[in-house]
Amino acid sequence: MFRLLKRACSFLLFFVIYQSFVIHHNVQRVLAYKPMVEKTLAENDTKANVDLVLAMIYTETKGGEADVMQSSESSSGQKNSITDSQASIEHGVNLLSHNLALAEEAGVDSWTAVQAYNFGTAYIDYIAKHGGQNTVDLATTYSKTVVAPSLGNTSGQTYFYYHPLALISGGKLYKNGGNIYYSREVHFNLYLIELMSLF
C-alpha cells in the first residue's frame, strides 16, 4: 500500500513539474507578442490593455499559431484565413475594442465584452437585457439557445471539455455553442501570465 502511494505521489509530482514547464513555455511564447500588442494598442483608441490581450492570446492559441487571436472567423467567416500574427492581433484588438465600447454604452460589465469575443457581439445586448453582468448561467443559456442552434446544433448536443474551470461547473459545452467559460479562462490566464512572468 505504501509503495503504491509513493508511486502515485511520484507520478503526481512529475505531472505538476511537467505541466509547470509547459505552462511557462507557453507563457514565454505569448509574451513574445507583447511589443506587437503594445504597438497595436497605441494605434487604437481603446479601453483594452496589454495584459488582457495577452491573456486572450494565451486562451485562444497559447501563441502557437499564426492567427494568434483566432481572428479569422470574425474577419472572413472562415477558419485560418488570417496567416499573419500582426493582422490577427490588429483585427482581434479592433473587435475587442468595439465590444468594450458597446459594453460600456449598454451598461454591462467588461467581462461581457470579453465573452462576446467568443460568442459574438449580440451577446452584449443579451446581457444588457438580463441583469448587466456576465455569468456562467447566462452564458450557458445563450450558448444553448442562440449560438449552438445558429450553427446547426438544435438538439442541445454537448461534449466534455477538459479544462479545470469547466470541470468545476460540470465540464460540458454545447457542440457549435462557443465556450461558455471563455471570459473566466481569460481572467484566470491574466493571473497565470503575471505569475509565470516572475520566473
From Swiss-Prot:
Top-level lineage group: Bacteria
TM region(s), chain numbering: none
UniProt-listed InterPro entries: CwlT-like_lysozyme, Lysozyme-like_dom_sf
SUPFAM superfamilies: Lysozyme-like (SSF53955)
Name of the protein described by the UniProt record: Pneumococcal vaccine antigen A homolog
Pfam families linked: Lysozyme_like
Subcellular location: Cell surface
Main location: other
Gene (UniProt): pvaA
GO CC term, one of those recorded: cell surface
